[in-house]
Amino acid sequence: MTKKHLTETRFADLALHPKIQQAISSAGFEYCTPIQALSLPVALSNRDVAGQAQTGTGKTLAFLLATFNRLMQNESSEKTESGPRALIMAPTRELAIQIAHDADALIEHCGLKMGVIYGGEGYEGQKEQLAAQPDILVGTTGRLIDFYKQDLFSLKDIEVVVLDEADRMFDLGFIDDIRYLLQKMPDPSKRLNLLFSATLSYRVQELAYEHMNAPTKLEVEPLQKTATRVTEELFYPSKPEKFPLLLTLIEEDWPDKAIVFANTKHGCEKVHGWLVANEHRAGLLTGDVPQKKRLRILEDFAEGKLDFLVATDVAARGLHIPEVTHVYNFDLPDDCEDYVHRIGRTGRAGASGAAISLACEEYVYNLPAIEDYIGHTIPVTKYDGDALLSDLRRPRPIQRRRRHNSGGGKGKPRGRRSGPPRNAS
């Protein structure tokens, strides 16, 4: 979240614990984002929240502040079990890690302990976290249930429960796990329940009313599905021209930090191969990439060691990557909601961004549903096929292994074009 003045609501005017106010002040935050301004007064009065908000709107800080405040206000609560006082559930391990990272300043000032539990990593280090009896536990449902069934922690002392990106948990099939964990906790009336979702669909609302205590439904600009600061652009390439067009647009835009989406793992591998072959610093993020390598790729991308991240929707969902300037939809997504999630990676918290989509003959049929969902047509840009980059290096054939390499070299792409491709007659 940036330090921009996004609403008239100041953190200093909210009923937050003094140590939390110190943490906010030290981080340089003064004004709330819209979702924070709506949800915090409700949550700080110990009322449940079901909030609709995209990633990048400041919702993570909103539920972290509410969680820490509840625990700090009830410091005298005596734990009767070897379990946490708050549980934050996330759909992906990357999101769980990011949530814990975002809580660092609060942990430093408040003195509460946090543990992070997720799959894809060894058990021993996470068991040590549980042995330290954290006040707040962040995790993915599968590993949480695994450790719970081993009696490594209890849920009987839960005072706050957070469901982040609830819609994605449905998409990934985690809803039964969520219900299992919620049923092991105290009654909803005895805890603070916070749910955040990019969409408050019927099934998400059903979950909220089933396991929450009369939640207040909050929506941030529900009719504005795409960010107003994101410039959208659509091209109609033929299949053979998709890679040359993508690489030409990248050279023309020369983005500081960009994410390229493809619909399949193999599609991502091909895009990544073309980028690396033409000397772009790119990382590949699919479900097959081992966890430690995923974290290294994300760290390199965040630190500017990589300029491009090539990803599938499932692999990228829930990631909090700041300062993404461009999103390229190499394929138009099959799910119209994924289009919104993709382009929502840029233009966050007051910044501007660009979303460029390629509608080839294979995926162009997804366009009507996308435009109907977002409520507007995407501006079309014509291009001159003769102006595309020539003499591009073709990637080496992909070797089918259980693990795929990612990364890239430095430098500019080869084969200068004769002129700009955009707005050609």
UniProtKB/Swiss-Prot annotation:
Disordered: annotated segments: 391-425
BP GO terms, sorted: RNA catabolic process
Entry-linked CDD domains: DEADc, SF2_C_DEAD
Annotated S-S bridges: none
Catalysed reactions listed for this entry: ATP + H2O = ADP + phosphate + H(+)
GO MF annotation, one: ATP binding
SMART domains: DEXDc, HELICc
Major localization listed first in the record, in broad terms: cytoplasm
Stretches assigned to the Helicase ATP-binding domain: 40-218
Record: residues binding ATP: 53-60
Motif Q motif, residue numbers: 9-37
Cellular component, GO annotation: cytosol
Position of sequence motif DEAD box: 164-167
Compositional bias ranges of the Basic residues kind: 395-419
EC number: 3.6.4.13
PROSITE patterns membership: DEAD_ATP_HELICASE, HELICASE_ATP_BIND_1, HELICASE_CTER, Q_MOTIF
Subunit field text: Component of the RNA degradosome, which is a multiprotein complex involved in RNA processing and mRNA degradation.
Listed HAMAP family: DEAD_helicase_RhlB
NCBIfam families given in the database record: PRK04837.1 (NF003419)
Function: DEAD-box RNA helicase involved in RNA degradation. Has RNA-dependent ATPase activity and unwinds double-stranded RNA.
Family: Belongs to the DEAD box helicase family. RhlB subfamily.
Protein name: ATP-dependent RNA helicase RhlB
Native organism: Idiomarina loihiensis (strain ATCC BAA-735 / DSM 15497 / L2-TR)
